[in-house]
Amino acid sequence: MRKIFTLFFCAASLATGLAQQESYFTNPVIHGDVADPSIIRIDQTYYITGTSSEWAPYYPVFTSTDLVNWQQTGHVFDEKPEWTKSSFWAPEWYQHKGKVYVYYTARKQSDNISCIGVAVADSPTGKFKDYGPVVEFGKEAIDAFILEDKGKLYISWKAYGLDNQPIELLACKLTDDGLRLDGKPFSLLRDDERQGMEGQHWFKKDGYYYIIYSVRGCCGPQSDYAVSVARSKKLEGPYEKYQGNPILHGSKEVLSIGHGTITTTPDGRMYYLCHAYQPGSGFYQGRQPYLQEVRMGEDHWPHFVTGEYASRTQPMPFAESAQVPVFDFSDDFTGATLRPEWSWNYPYTDVKTEIKNGKLSLSGTPKPGVKTGAALCLRPTSPDYTLETAIVNRNDSWKGITMYGDANNLITCGCAGDRLILKYILELSLIHISEPTRLRCIS
């Protein structure tokens, strides 16, 4: 068996094992960097997609029947839509007239401005047909969310994030097919506090329209992301911000948390899926999906069942289910195609793969100025890990394993011809080598 364990440094994940009891589970529910997650239920099956940033394929897709145990099945796009360039962020599911829509953020080839595109398929795991940009607004339009009200579709998004003015959550009616704007945009909510505002979930319940949105800093070691809420009796507002905001924020075991969407169980319970950073070494696992139950209080505001401080330990959504432990990843390359867990950093190298007779052939053409080769990557399941691979060393090309952040931040170990090579490139100083590195060569 030939195994390849390759990882990317910025998107690791934590192995949590079994939940403490059968009636509880431990967040994250997906191990690895899947930021800005969107969740939808179709019949008895739940589907997640999320940000893929500069990694291909684009927007990973996961499925589950119990909200806790997830399996990656593929991606929304195997190839980039023609109009897009980079920054594949915040996809949002929506089901309409028997079709599944995904509204996603990407930068345009023409001017590098982030806008919102739309694609349609028969199911979340089907082949999506892209219909191009649906929202182009100023310097940036990101973080789409769809609401149907009185038979009409409305799209909301974050605007003015790159302007010298308060961020606003804007909205506009869509055409009946959900593919184009129909009318003029209007403002839902404004960030007068200048603390940040994005990642909204917009819904109607018990006579109110609610916007659950994220505030403060989304990303990085100083992230203090949190979740707030506003409500209105009218779709177009004005929206009243909850005096007790934020309703969900970090804790001793969660650095920061936010940007999510709500799904409902068949019996009507509401679960909010968002992303969170973990403190300490877990931070480098990236923004991982967290699941928390939310209920409407007697005050007609939504509240999280386990309180405003984010908690990794949560009650199981379904008593008959139990959280399955995370197993080590291995691949013997006996399938006809690559497993969906694999990805590559597309801005730096065009990756080509061939699987034949239990072997993977990996090659690629680096972009101008890039000094590294092709890297096929996956998210590990712990901040501490062992990597092992068997390679066929038949030429002078470099081959081996890598800890990979991007082409400017990596550690590699492998061989070329009769040479055993260990090298690293560190631009961001995020990798610290505190102990001597040991190499073992098995002939």
PLM feature segments, named:
Residues 366-421:
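Secretory/extracellular carbohydrate-interaction modules
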Residues 63-64, 117-123, 170-175, 227-234, ...:
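Beta-propeller blade signature
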Residues 429-442:
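Residue-level detector of conserved catalytic or cofactor/ligand-binding positions
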Residues 29, 35-55, 74, 89-109, ...:
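Hydrophobic core segments of beta-strands in well-ordered, beta-rich domains
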Residues 338-362:
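Extracellular glycan-recognition surfaces and repeat-rich motifs
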Residues 21-30, 69-81, 122-137, 173-195, ...:
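Blade-edge beta-strand/turn elements of extracellular beta-propeller
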Residues 308-341:
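Extracellular carbohydrate-recognition regions
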Residues 194-240, 255:
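Loop/turn-rich, solvent-exposed surfaces of beta-rich toroidal or solenoidal domains
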